[in-house]
């Protein structure tokens, strides 16, 4: 059975592409027709592609891999954060900082600085410092949290990226390519699908469409993790039974 139904996709407006004058010819194979100057995406292909992406993400998560959710456009920001947190993964929903992947050691230093400031706030250090200094430090902490909060617990470079709108996230894609990190992405009719390993042809501007598809990728991770938990529970139960038998 498919991970997602045609009905769900239609209701979320996943089929609406961009205006016909704003298109990438490489997306032609994913286009069903044109209506009132707008391309209509072939949802049968979207269903198939969601299945492929879901299976890839689930298998990656089952092997302990990390997925970085990326969506800095307004329509994606909230969903990217919510679904990454729900699935226990990491996210970037503000500006992508150059070198986030290719220069992770430098980014890690900034993350350590953020954690240091958070600790200072928690342990009461701010209370004994001059007010002016505290204001400056809090400003720095807020800024670091804004850009790095979603990756501050990420142990290293992620094993895959999930991206909303490849045109918007060109730097992230270029960095992932340099490091051979696979990319899953919601790809609209104005994007280049050749840059993406797992293309999900869909409307990347409608909040409902972005929410539906992003939540499915989060579901794949959760399903994999639940499977791990069940395997661990079974192992504990088997061990207990073996001990009793002795």
UniProtKB/Swiss-Prot annotation:
InterPro entries: Ribosomal_uS2 (IPR001865), Ribosomal_uS2_bac/mit/plastid (IPR005706), Ribosomal_uS2_CS (IPR018130), Ribosomal_uS2_flav_dom_sf (IPR023591). It comes from the Bacteria. Coiled coil: none annotated. One of its GO terms (biological process) is translation. GO terms for molecular function: structural constituent of ribosome. Belongs to the universal ribosomal protein uS2 family. This is Small ribosomal subunit protein uS2. It comes from Exiguobacterium sp. (strain ATCC BAA-1283 / AT1b).
